[in-house]
Design a protein with these regions (language model features):
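Non-transmembrane, aqueous-exposed alpha-helical and coiled segments at domain scale
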Residues: 319-350, 357-406
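Short, well-ordered loop/turn elements at secondary-structure boundaries
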Residues: 63, 263, 286-288, 345-347, ...
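Long, contiguous, compositionally biased segments that the model treats as domain-scale units
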Residues: 1-143
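Active-site-facing alpha/beta catalytic cores
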Residues: 75-76, 80-327, 367-370, 378, ...
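Short glycine-enriched loops at secondary-structure junctions
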Residues: 115, 356-357
């Protein structure tokens, strides 16, 4: 695929000349410098040809020939980098993609919010409890969640620990996939132990049986195995928030004559850091990766037109994904102006719905949660609005886990506020559990099946 030449007015550190939000303040500048220099010497976590391959797949999704499934933890934990948990996360994403393949009848692009999702933006730099004020928890590659002075102090060494865990995670995922874990002949490999008790299990098994029958039919017809049915492509993604970390993993690839962020395949910019004059937009405009930006109620038409111009000046297919997040109550009013603004520019973008962040609320018990009905309502409205405006919703962005947690209420099991304390494990935002995630995939398949 032809690529645009590198920018003459950009460098991996040019963002430092711009106002940059959500960056931790480190007491020991020398220790920070040592950590960043070490990161810059370490091998990349991903490689440029994987990134280029993903850009091509996202271009197909922009054209309506594929659908993006983008999901994983709100914030990964260094302590959760263990084989069983990674397997469960991969299983639920594979199960969802199987349902979507069956329902949508098109390729599914599988991207995990994993192998690097260790930094989180916060609404305040500090947190106060019982009269004690400490730095806010910003994710495990910055500081630690326990509310004590030592844990909350930003530690440069955690940048290296985050890199190590990200590399271990993605290496394990690759080994599983290359070893046949994702073989379409054996979807039973993906079953979660506790899934058999789910109200949606039989519906899922029916999808598996239908796909298995189709696969065997085509193999019988062809007289040989279906090409590439023994593995799937899987990509990693995280919010490119901590720019010193991202800068350290940005490398110049001579054969492409471009700079790539080799810490992940698809980095994204969050709503809080997407200012046109900010450091994040400056950094992202210069890397060759496909990139995504979260947009919501605060984005107006003029801003969005300028954003797509700055981030994708060459109108490169597969380059730019826009992830909209409004909430069920606001999407019908807010989304049309964004669609019309982008349509007027002629830039190719992939529209993706994040039905999670706009639907977060707090219960009287103090738990943050999301109502499953609100999540589904935002998704359904997103599909309808895009159709009404001659656009296409090409993907979904979800915070989810393969664990049997109780963080979002509702779903087939009818979880209530009273269930939240039973298995609430997230340190930041509530996630869909395996059952709710699969139910979302089934709803998308029903909404879009046959279109």
């Amino acid at each position: 695929m032809a690529t645009a030449p590198r920018l003459a007015d950009w460098a991996p550190d040019s963002w430092q000349r711009h106002p940059t939000l959500q960056q931790p303040v480190y007491k020991d500048a020398d220790a920070l410098g040592r950590a960043v220099r070490s990161l810059a010497k370490l091998p990349p976590i991903v490689v440029s040809w994987e990134i280029d391959e993903l850009r091509g797949r996202l271009a197909a999704a922009q054209q309506g020939r594929a659908f993006l499934l983008h999901g994983g933890d709100c914030a990964e934990s260094l302590d959760d980098c263990e084989s069983d948990r990674i397997v469960r996360q991969l299983k639920v994403l594979l199960q969802m993609s199987l349902v979507l393949v069956h329902g949508l009848r098109q390729p599914i692009i599988r991207i995990g919010r994993m192998a690097g999702q260790y930094a989180k933006p916060r609404s305040s730099d500090v947190e106060t409890r019982d009269g004690v004020t400490l730095p806010a928890y910003r994710g495990d590659n910055v500081n630690r969640a326990p509310f004590d002075a030592r844990s909350r102090e930003p530690d440069p060494e955690l940048l290296l620990r985050g890199y190590e865990r990200a590399a271990l995670t993605l290496n394990f995922v690759r080994a599983l996939i290359d070893g046949g874990f994702a073989d379409l002949h054996h979807p039973e490999y993906w079953d979660l132990d506790f899934m058999r008790h789910s109200p949606k299990y039989e519906e899922y098994r029916a999808v598996v049986a239908a796909l298995s029958d189709s696969l065997h039919f085509f193999e019988s017809l062809a007289g040989k195995p279906v090409h590439d049915s023994h593995r799937v492509d899987f990509y990693a993604s995280h919010e490119g928030l901590h720019l010193l970390y991202e800068q350290a993993q940005t490398r110049y690839i001579r054969r492409q004559e471009r700079w790539y962020n080799l810490s992940t395949h698809l980095p994204w910019i969050g709503v809080r850091t997407a200012a046109l004059d900010g450091g994040h937009v400056e950094y992202f405009r210069g890397i060759a990766n496909p990139i995504a930006v979260k947009v919501g109620p605060s984005a107006d038409a003029d801003y969005l037109r300028e954003l797509v111009r700055v981030l994708d000046p060459d109108r490169e297919p597969g380059r730019l994904t826009l992830i909209h997040r409004f909430g069920a109550a606001g999407i019908e009013r807010g989304l049309p102006r964004l669609i019309e603004a982008v349509q007027g520019t002629g830039h190719p973008v992939l529209w993706v719905c994040d039905p999670m962040h706009g639907n977060t609320e707090s219960t009287p018990s103090g738990h943050k949660t999301r109502r499953f009905d609100s999540i589904l309502a935002e998704l359904e409205t997103a599909f309808a609005v895009h159709r009404a405006y001659g656009s296409r919703l090409g993907g979904v962005h979800l915070e989810l886990t393969g664990d049997n947690v109780t963080e979002c209420t509702g779903g087939a099991r009818g979880l209530s506020d009273g269930d939240l304390a039973r298995a609430y494990r997230s340190t930041v935002d509530p996630r869909l559990n395996f059952e709710q995630a699969l139910e979302v995939a089934m709803r998308i398949a029903r909404l879009q099946g046959g279109r």
